[in-house]
Amino acid sequence: MPRLGSRTIERLAIQRMDHIGIVVEDLVAATDFFVQLGLEPQGTGMVEGGWVDRIVGLEGVRAENTMLQTPDGDARVELTKFHAPPAQGGNGHAPVNTLGLRHVTFAVDDLDAVVAGLRARGAELVGKVEQYEDIYRLCYVWGPEGIIVELAERIG
């Protein structure tokens, strides 16, 4: 069993990360943003019925999903628009230190080109482009509806 500091941790048996789910209000705008980044649409569909209600713990779910895949096929992003019950909360541009899942990171070959392309489409950086040691150039970008996307260019 692996150790973390003084703790021994018993591991379960996951195989890999399959996808990350992001709830959005404007499914088209969010899809367009991620497609512009380079993700490939895999399909859009409506989910509803008792089976989905039981999985998510809500009643009367009617939701539209778009699945997007990274070019290497190793990861996917599922964007979901809840038609019923309506989505709750959401703090548009919550700061990066807000508790909970706060960003998703994508590797890029040319950070400057990707940032320039996103800026041309109206996206804004959360902070600045910075270098981490001799390993990465990194930045955070505001996506639609306050989604934070980290871009990472490996340099070393």
How would you name each of these model-derived features?
Residues 90, 94-98:
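Non-DNA-binding regulatory cores of transcription-related proteins
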Residues 23-74, 113, 120, 139:
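Core segments of cupin and vicinal oxygen chelate
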Residues 2-13, 44-46, 64-67, 75-77, ...:
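Vicinal oxygen chelate
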Residues 46-47, 82-84:
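Histidine- and/or cysteine-centered catalytic micro-motif in compact active-site loops
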Residues 19, 101-103:
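Eukaryotic phosphotyrosine signaling hubs
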Residues 12-17, 21-23:
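Terminus-proximal functional modules
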Residues 74, 83-86:
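Active-site/binding-pocket entry motifs
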